[in-house]
Swiss-Prot record:
This is Cytokinin dehydrogenase. Its main location: membrane. Its EC number is 1.5.99.12. It comes from Triticum aestivum. GO terms for molecular function: cytokinin dehydrogenase activity.
Length: 15
């Protein structure tokens, strides 16, 4: 799992 993917996932959840 790449950090960018995780960040994107978290951002999607935040949004």
């Amino acid at each position: 799992f790449l950090p960018k993917s995780l960040f994107t996932l978290v951002t999607d959840k935040s949004l």
